């Protein structure tokens, strides 16, 4: 069994050694330009076209929760990956726990009005504010996949009213489910906090725009943990300036790194983190990949395979 590995920023040597230990029967090598030797599996992130083109692979593993970079490259270069080759993403591997920490901490930050108190502190102003009430602080999750379900579970502990929206209806205990475009307006109408965990597909690009924001309650909050392309940044800035959106926590952006001239940097109602809400945990990823390869070698049916037509 031959495995090729490519990631532009990861510690390649660590990964190769960890994979060799986890899959002793495998010959693991770092892929370099010009390497056309045979391979059974490819572990990749933003791979060059030549790495995968023409190979008879058993599977490709994307080293992250999203596969949009691979799928977008496939649109431009269909020859990069044969249609018969399964594509897998890292469904969790510790990312669910990180998303839970990030989402819960920020929801509580807004619920306890720490954002308002920070603004008061900046002007040396002492003024206790009325508290928010849980029953009026409905949290809506856009995107009800693996990470969305994890976030919903963690927020249930705090007894907030919860709802989710996705392409198909979900049966999550304690979470009101909405499905399809025809139910999006009803979903949005009660969301004091909107958490975006949608996949990046042609249908979801620009979905958080002026039209969507107008359907939220006045003074809603936005937490974007998915992809920057989901948000029309000018529309969000206008909503923040008008008070329609009271605050935004943004981990992802249309351009990354976020350009210094972006107005988001200086907005008093925006908090920015540099795409760190959930990062790949190498040890857990290696364990998942080695287990999945073992199952593939046995011919077992697996979860986590990407539907290329849907984009996730």
Curated annotation (Swiss-Prot):
Key word Cytoplasm present in the record? Answer: yes
What subcellular locations does the record give? Answer: Cytoplasm
The record ties this protein, via InterPro entries, to: D-isomer_DH_CS, D-isomer_DH_NAD-bd, GhrA_Enterobacterales, NAD(P)-bd_dom_sf
Give GO MF terms, alphabetically. Answer: glyoxylate reductase (NADPH) activity; hydroxypyruvate reductase (NADH) activity; hydroxypyruvate reductase (NADPH) activity; NAD binding
At the top of the EC hierarchy, this enzyme's class is: oxidoreductase
One GO CC term of this entry? cytosol
Question: What is the protein's major site of localization?
Answer: cytoplasm
Q: Which UniProt keywords apply?
A: Cytoplasm, NAD, NADP, Oxidoreductase
Q: Which reaction does it catalyse?
A: glycolate + NADP(+) = glyoxylate + NADPH + H(+); (R)-glycerate + NAD(+) = 3-hydroxypyruvate + NADH + H(+); (R)-glycerate + NADP(+) = 3-hydroxypyruvate + NADPH + H(+)
Q: Does the keyword NADP apply?
A: yes
**Enzyme Commission identifier(s):** 1.1.1.79, 1.1.1.81
Q: Where is the active site?
A: 227, 275
Q: Which family does it belong to?
A: Belongs to the D-isomer specific 2-hydroxyacid dehydrogenase family. GhrA subfamily.
Give the HAMAP family listed for this entry: 2_Hacid_dh_C_GhrA
**What name does the UniProt record give this protein?**
Glyoxylate/hydroxypyruvate reductase A
* Organism the protein comes from: Escherichia coli O6:H1 (strain CFT073 / ATCC 700928 / UPEC)
């Amino acid at each position: 069994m031959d495995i090729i590995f490519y990631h532009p920023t990861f510690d390649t040597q660590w990964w190769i050694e960890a994979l060799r230990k986890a899959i002793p029967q495998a010959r693991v090598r770092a892929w370099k330009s010009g390497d056309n030797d045979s391979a059974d599996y490819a572990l990749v992130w933003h791979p060059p076209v030549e790495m995968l083109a023409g190979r008879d692979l058993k599977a490709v593993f994307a080293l992250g929760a999203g596969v949009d970079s691979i799928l977008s490259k496939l649109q431009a270069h269909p020859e990069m990956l044969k249609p018969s080759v399964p594509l897998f993403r890292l469904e969790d591997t510790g990312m669910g726990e990180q998303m839970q920490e990030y989402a819960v901490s920020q929801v509580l930050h807004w619920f306890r009005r720490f954002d308002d108190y920070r603004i008061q502190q900046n002007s040396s102003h002492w003024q206790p504010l009325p508290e928010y009430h849980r029953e009026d602080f409905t949290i809506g999750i856009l995107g009800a996949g693996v990470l969305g379900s994890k976030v919903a579970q963690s927020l249930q502990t705090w007894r907030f009213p919860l709802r989710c929206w996705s392409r198909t209806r979900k049966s999550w205990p304690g979470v009101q489910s909405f499905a399809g475009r025809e139910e999006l307006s009803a979903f949005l109408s009660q969301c004091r906090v909107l958490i975006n965990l949608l996949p990046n597909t042609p249908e979801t690009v620009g979905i958080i725009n002026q039209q969507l924001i107008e359907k939220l309650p006045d003074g809603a909050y936005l937490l974007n943990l998915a992809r920057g392309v989901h948000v029309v940044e000018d529309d969000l800035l206008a909503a923040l300036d008008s008070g329609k959106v009271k605050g935004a926590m943004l981990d992802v952006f249309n351009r990354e790194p976020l350009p210094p001239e972006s107005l988001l940097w200086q907005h008093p109602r925006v908090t920015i983190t540099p795409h760190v809400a959930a990062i790949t945990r190498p040890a857990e990823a290696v364990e998942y990949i080695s287990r999945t390869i073992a199952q593939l070698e046995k011919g077992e049916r697996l979860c986590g395979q990407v539907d290329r037509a849907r984009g996730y």
